[in-house]
């Protein structure tokens, strides 16, 4: 399976009167069944053309051409996991997994959100698409109007180095370097109600006991102390052949944010910068789409 999006921008407010066109991402995904109980899943994402050598026209430098050693995009392993199906109510998955916080992460394909871009509310304050390495237990229980799906996970926790003023904890997901820091893992739980045809109502909780322990240079946070992060989300979607309606709420709380801010501000890095508020609340009002 593959999916991607193409975007065209007409720069009417640009003094150069230039239009741009780009393919932000292209994704290849596949599942392989060893047998009826064991399944291998993988998803590889190419963003902004991937990596390689490119030539750019630098209009700000008298129209000079420059050859860059790498593009601004990336090739990322978004998912790679092995699943053991045991029972409809209890199954196990291990590997690189999607963290099911919010409405978009678990349903991030372009057909699952309105417009050409993912919702700003979620993508601004939490990672998107959020994927970490760990272990997951999942299943379904109940039947009829009392049917539920659940997920319980232990994954690599957020890295405090990536927290910032503009995006709260969105820059803190692991994967920047070759190895992920697993000193303080995160615990994730999600429950979805699916008893009514076309309706999905879900709630999720994320907890990491100490995000500073996952920092790449955690000795810089010795004066900060243990700093946990909690994120809560609730979302709902109703869909039939005439209309689609979606809504979600995200709330988060970070301990010792002012102290962490001082450390991240002092990090002389191209990757991490900025200060953050203690907590951030986002409410996405229900939206609808007629089809």
What is the predicted function of each stretch?
Residues 5-12, 52-59, 73-76, 106-111, ...:
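Outer-membrane beta-barrel translocator domains and adjoining extracellular loop/strand segments
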Residues 97, 250, 286:
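Anionic group-transfer/hydrolysis microenvironments
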Residues 14-18, 68-70, 122-127, 176-180, ...:
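Outer-membrane beta-barrel domain signature
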Residues 4, 106, 116-117, 149, ...:
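Outer-membrane pore/translocation modules
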Residues 193-283:
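Detector for outer-membrane/organellar transmembrane beta-barrel domains
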Residues 282-291:
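Single conserved hydrophobic/aromatic residue that forms the stacking wall/gate
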Residues 1-4, 15-160, 183-188, 192-200, ...:
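Outer membrane beta-barrel
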